[in-house]
Swiss-Prot record:
Protein name per UniProt: NADPH-dependent 7-cyano-7-deazaguanine reductase
GO BP: any one term: queuosine biosynthetic process
Subunit annotation: Homodimer.
SUPFAM superfamilies: Tetrahydrobiopterin biosynthesis enzymes-like (SSF55620)
Signal peptide: none
Catalytic residues (positions): 187, 194
Known catalytic reactions: 7-aminomethyl-7-carbaguanine + 2 NADP(+) = 7-cyano-7-deazaguanine + 2 NADPH + 3 H(+)
A GO MF label: preQ1 synthase activity
Length: 279
């Protein structure tokens, strides 16, 4: 990726910013997916053909027609085929612009979000806005699968390398789900830490747990957006393990009232958006 690309240098990330409280869709800033995908060899149908960037928006507020503040939580799913991902700070600033703006109904807010986000992403975006009473009924969940974090191994290098995956696939073909809560990368622009959990569901030769964990830990000083990290994990696993089926799903902790949960697969549909303990 060219980190000096004009589409990145214009981002609000890392810059002193004015917080607007009147509705302004121009605050949204796109980042072309191709900046990262070209280097990974990703096309519209390869190596994954389904997925979304699932966002949870916890700080959503507006005024009703009487001027009384309203609060809600929104689930947003940006289709993986969209031309752009949406830069997170611009998303936060955009949501803040609803704060002193009157909307006739929750449905109008939902429709406005879907329209603006679809335009910024240049692709399909689905939005569901929930009253707090509805959202509080949702459970806190954990990823299904075998957690690989409790290994007695020594690590002294935290520089990203996909070479940790060399010969990671060994033995018989299995179907299994592996989980790690040790995923940590850094924002591409600001280098702020991004903390996440990752779930890998695959059909293929059995993966060596130690090598896989070393690979995931090597993201610890790596600078890339959430969505790009998940796509890199997916393409690296395809390259080194050649599985028959693969899903990579990460759920990151929230920042600025937003969490981002990228899902990529070549055989499964996007799951329900259920938060985990750190979210």
């Amino acid at each position: 990726m060219n980190y000096n690309d004009k589409s990145l240098s214009a981002l609000k990330l890392g810059q002193k910013t004015e917080y607007k409280s009147e509705y302004d869709p121009t605050l949204l800033q796109p980042v072309p997916r191709k900046l990262n995908r070209d280097g990974l060899g990703i096309t519209e149908q390869q190596p994954f053909d389904r997925g979304a960037d699932v966002w949870t928006c916890y700080e959503l507020s507006w005024l009703n027609e009487n001027g009384l503040p309203q609060v809600a939580i929104a689930d947003v799913a940006i289709d993986f085929r969209s031309e752009n991902l949406i830069e997170s700070k611009s998303f936060k600033l955009y949501l803040n612009s609803f704060n002193q703006t009157k909307f006739a109904s929750l449905e109008q807010v939902e429709q406005t979000l879907a329209k603006d986000l679809s335009q910024c992403a240049s692709g399909q975006v689905s939005v569901k806005v929930y009253k707090l009473s509805a959202y509080t009924q949702q459970p806190i969940v954990d990823f299904a699968g075998e957690c690989i974090d409790e290994q007695d191994i020594q690590i002294d290098s935290y520089e990203f390398s996909n070479e940790h995956l060399a010969s990671v696939a060994e033995g018989e073909v299995v179907e299994e789900t592996l989980v790690s809560h040790l995923l940590k990368s850094n924002c591409l622009i600001t280098s702020q830490p991004d903390w996440g959990s990752v779930q890998i569901h695959y059909v293929g030769k059995k993966l060596n747990r130690e090598k896989l964990l070393r690979y995931l830990v090597s993201f610890r000083e790596h600078n890339e957006f959430h969505e790009q990290c998940v796509e890199r994990i997916f393409t690296d696993l395809i390259q080194f393990t050649q599985p028959e089926k693969l899903t990579v799903y990460a759920r990151y902790t929230r920042r600025g009232g937003l969490d981002i949960n990228p899902f990529r697969s070549n055989f499964e549909s996007v799951p329900q958006n259920l938060r985990m303990a750190r979210q």
